[in-house]
Amino acid sequence: MSIAGLVASRIRDIPDFPQPGVVFKDITPLLADAGAFGQTIEYLADWLDRVGAELVVGIEARGFILAAPAALQAGLGFVPLRKPGKLPGVTLRESYALEYGEAALEMHEDAIRAGTRVAVMDDVLATGGTAAAAADLLERAGAQVVGLSFLIELAALKGRAKLPGRDLDCLLTVL
């Protein structure tokens, strides 16, 4: 079975979560299957090597679950992008619009040296707002974003449109 088929077989649809009309893509069955999760992490570590990443960035919260073990497998460091107010010390912040309101991501000001080749990981590419904010924040910090990887792309939400010219890796694309 292909890695995409394996991931697809371990994703559970939860209808009407977190609100009516939304079908939530639950990755916990994938995480609970050590073999499938391990193969997924190996795939992600190989992708990190292919894009020439020097550092891996995970987006809170489920991006941490993927990025940290993939970084370790690839022999790279890991940097978390957090929700506001979760990191002590001096931080950089990038705000972005949501359908109804605003959100933001933060990172430690000194987490990344200028010119470092970074790869970003998260579980789902939906509207692209969070991923675009992450890339913008990292570039403002001086990093070179070499790629963004997602387990699942929700193609109907057109997140790719907010990431023009970016190297994207999506294991599973659903409509």
What are these regions (language model features)?
Residues L76-V118:
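Short, glycine/charge-rich flexible loops or terminal/linker lids adjacent to PRPP-binding catalytic cores
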Residues R50, A97, E109-R113, A141, ...:
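Solvent-exposed alpha-helices and their adjacent loops that cap or buttress functional pockets
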Residues G52-E60:
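Short glycine-rich phosphate-binding loop at a beta-alpha junction
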Residues E54, T116, V146:
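Conserved acidic residues
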Residues D123, G128:
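Conserved G/P- and acidic residue-centered "switch" motifs that form tight phosphate/ATP-binding loops
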Residues I65-A74, A135:
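Short Gly/Thr/Asp-enriched flexible loops that form oxyanion-binding sites at enzyme active sites
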Residues I3, S9, A132-L175:
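PRPP-dependent phosphoribosyltransferase catalytic core
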Residues M1-A53, A103:
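Active-site-facing substrate-recognition patch
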